[in-house]
Amino acid sequence: MNREILVHVDLDGQPVFCGRLWTRSAPRESASFEYDVAWRTSRRGFALDPELPLAAGPFHTGRPIFRAFTDPAPDRWGQMLLRRAERALARREGRNPRTLTAVDFLTLVDDETRLGALRFRDAAANGGPFLSTGGTRVPPLMALSKLLAATTRIIADEETDEDLALVLAPGTSLGGARPKASVKDSDGNLLVAKFPTASDEWPATRWEATALELARRAGIHVPVFRLALAARKPVLLLRRFDRDGEARVPFMSAMTALSADDNQMHSYLDIVDALRREGAQAAKDLGELWRRLVFNVLVSNTDDHLRNHGFLHDGIGWRLAPAYDLNPMPTDVRPRVHALAIDDTDPTASMDTVWEVAPRFGLATKEARQIAHEVAAVVRAWRSAGKKCGLKPKELDRMESAFEHRDLAQAAK
């Protein structure tokens, strides 16, 4: 089936028409996009994707959809929810479930909670509501226990239709594989709630909170976060950094910025190049990125792939988004080898390699070593930070190999 989608970008709280997206499902999924002339010639207009430069089109791709539209689409958790919902609907209607396409995943996501500032309308609806609008609204914090219970049943493949209805709208818009949902606090701020699961080998939400606390102390920009208990289990709450009050902030993952695919090896130096090319304050953000590189090596946050780095558009250009998805990893589960190479080719955690690439970040040796020393001094207090986040002595011991290693001692010198 062919579809035409009207693409809007929210700027200062108002949707601005940006262009048209055409998708085709046969003989295989593909897409085309063309900017609206007004957007392309406006001072406020910007390219959604390096593969979609701000120029006359149309542009075509043999991929199911352009990378710019994969960022606001669901990842594994959200896709699983949408497939479950389609199965339930097909069962009620007495038919086989249909295969959801890339544009289905994109447009079935709840509009209120969709990542970033892109919004979509169906051209055939002649200016109808944004996709997808309606249904269950974003639940309040007081619904955490219900959301946790529903996600637990969904993971066990024992959910009811009511469970899907509760989780579908707030849960489909967020990336990653961990169960999560959007909720609102008493001030109306949009939050991400990350839930623990029965299969967690350690208290994952408490450890992520610990890593965020260490990063914050180390001078790294992180979202506002806290732990809350739901049914006596720790839920990690993070304020959405792609929202400024009610206004949406454009977001682009490093995966999109580099026109990359999951099966390709990339490096921190590729992100450096992207910041130099597209950044509104490249020098400042390169210093921040260097600090994050040191931190990731010292806490063994090895799952630092390109989807776990992102950029926010500030009206002038792209800025490094706050750090997110920070998760220490013990060496008996995974060696200290990062998803991204530190230099051009080597992903092995090593402060020796980190020192070597410092000039690529625009840092003199003295400044680079001072930053590393500051980060190391904070990371050395990982046990006290973990205790503050509710981790027990045995749980702290379980993660010791992620923190106590030669690189920490070397960075602290």
Q: Which ranges hold each PLM region?
A:
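Phosphate/dinucleotide-binding and metal-coordinating scaffold of catalytic cores
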Residues: 1-306, 310-413
